[in-house]
Amino acid sequence: MMQSHIDFALATPEILLLVLALAVLLIDAVSSHPDRKTTYVLSLATLAILTVVSLFQWSNGVSGKTFNGMYVTDSFSHLLKITSYIAVAVTLIYGRVYAQSRDMLRGGELYVLTLLALLGQMVMISAGSLVSVYLGLELMSLALYALIALRRDDVVATEAAMKYFVLGALASGFLLYGMSMVYGSTGHLDLAEISRVIGSGQAKELPLVFGIVFLVAGLAFKLGAVPFHMWVPDVYQGSPTAVTLILGGAPKLAAFAMTLRLLVDGLHGLAADWQSMLMILAVLSLAIGNLTAIVQTNFKRMLAYSTISHMGFVLLGLASGVVVGKAEAASAAYGASLFYMITYVLTTLASFGIVLLLSRQGFECEQIDDLKGLNRRSPWHALIVLLLMFSLAGIPPLVGFYAKLAILQAVIESGHVALAVVAVLFSLIGAFYYLRVVKVVYFDEPVAEDAPLSATCVQRGLLSVNGALILILGILPGGLMALCVQVIKTSFAGL
């Protein structure tokens, strides 16, 4: 049903971000700071303002739909947006020194494009229609393409941008084709209306199933799941590390939100069809991601394949949410996936933060061997690396262990014990390459002369907080986990 009243207040964060991003762009054009300090500070201030606004909306129970149902505000969107603001702010702080030393601040494009990419992510998170899903996705993707190619004289980065652009266009084509078939079958673009039509049995079933296949393929690409993962290692390795950090953070949250909105909000009535697809993608991602990561010598490439395997766990959680007649089990499964995604992004930020910390003018810390002897140079940062690798491997008492345990509990609750066993086996295989990094850090001799760590006190302090959170959330995961489950319950009424 079309709404005659448009409530702009619901979309205050997006409107505010658009205005502030344009203001940052204009101020940058007349700024005299060669290192773009003004633009940097204004970007962080923008993120702080957005965090306050979203917290205010959430605490006051602001929710609803506007723009004819194309935009949704609920507790799910509030949580993911606030997490995205924090992730982007951490990204900008970590990458500041790196961007300066790589001449990436000749203009203020790095900060403005990051804010515009965030705007696209926010639209994806609050999407209530196939149209808004696609508009948000394209806004985010176009900004990310430009960010990867920001160093115009870097041939490797330009190649990575071209690969991402071509394959991203293909994935967008899959999504568009799938959306067109869903629209043709149901006669609606609004996700709530699509769900209603499917539930009433009025939709044309055959084209709808084909539409789901194309939608899942497009979603798998954006998440980086096998067999649509081919862009992940090349783009992660080829991009400047500061941009790789941007790619591995908030965009993953937006892709997860898009997946949940489309499959749970819009296509929940056909869960039996997409559940089997997600399970296949999950097992393939766990297998290919972990087995391929073992042979990598490039640290960024290893983390890329690690990302693929972790997306397998997220997809397992989403597939496990399809439990007929058990709304509590479904909420727990989707909540576990949300918890996993948030904590994974937290760990990824710190992992690439370490790479940025160890990189300096004329030296890229990209090889695993570049971490040799880190314990001798900086025992504290070596300890952070140990915490990160143990968490990614799923070793207690770190948050990665609890995140995987929650997913496995959801998988077993849904009756797929064999899948849980497979996931555990591949996690054990994956532990090898994480422990190899720890071995290099603590037991190998450094291959080069010690050099001072090129990072400010703010960056080192933030990295320490980042590492501490991984331990604290592992020891006390209950609060965040309960919040994730509650957010799912209140935001997805169809469960």
UniProtKB/Swiss-Prot annotation:
Domain of life: Bacteria
RNA-binding listed as a keyword: no
Membrane topology: Multi-pass membrane protein
Alphabetized InterPro entries for the sequence: NADH-Q_OxRdtase_suN/2, ND/Mrp_TM
Membrane spanning residue stretches: 6-26, 38-58, 75-95, 107-127, 130-150, 164-184, 208-228, 240-260, 277-297, 304-324, 338-358, 382-402, 415-435, 468-488
Gene Ontology cellular-component annotations: plasma membrane
Localization annotation: Cell inner membrane
A Pfam family reported for this protein in Swiss-Prot or TrEMBL: Proton_antipo_M
Catalytic activity: a quinone + NADH + 5 H(+)(in) = a quinol + NAD(+) + 4 H(+)(out)
The protein's Enzyme Commission number: 7.1.1.-
Any GO BP: ATP synthesis coupled electron transport
Family that this chain belongs to: Belongs to the complex I subunit 2 family.
Protein name: NADH-quinone oxidoreductase subunit N
Gene for this chain: nuoN
